[in-house]
Amino acid sequence: MKSSTVTIEVSAPARYTYLDLTEELERAIKDSGVTDGAAIAFCPHTTCALLINEWEEGALEDFRNRVRHLVPEDVYYAHDDLDRRTQNLAESHERQNGHSHVKSMLLSASSHAIPISAGEAVLGRWQRLILFEMDEPKGRQVVFHVFGG
């Protein structure tokens, strides 16, 4: 069995923007030499999400608007209350991003397993692997672990 792990660095230009990572996934599969197996796409961050869906501006706008409506930025988040919070504090400043963490938890989309057949990702006709940034733009890692025969 072959196995390969590739980590890429990406950065969305702004909060609530998307990056299409499908080509990076396909490159990781091709470079692995795996023809039949699976690829796991994993994002080790708590304020962005990996989605598999259609890359269509209207659908992406609708999703962004629904997420922002479900979890508004302008309400109290205990995560942002530094008089109360005692865990996982950075040594530098703490961002007011409780809303981003709640959105990420609701989506529960830090990883996806994608089948591989004939050396290609098995995705539906319109499906793309998409990173959705819900916090400030910054460098993000996405890990592709490809395995199989």
Outline where the language-model segments fall.
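Active-site histidine-anchored catalytic micro-motif
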Residues: M1-G149
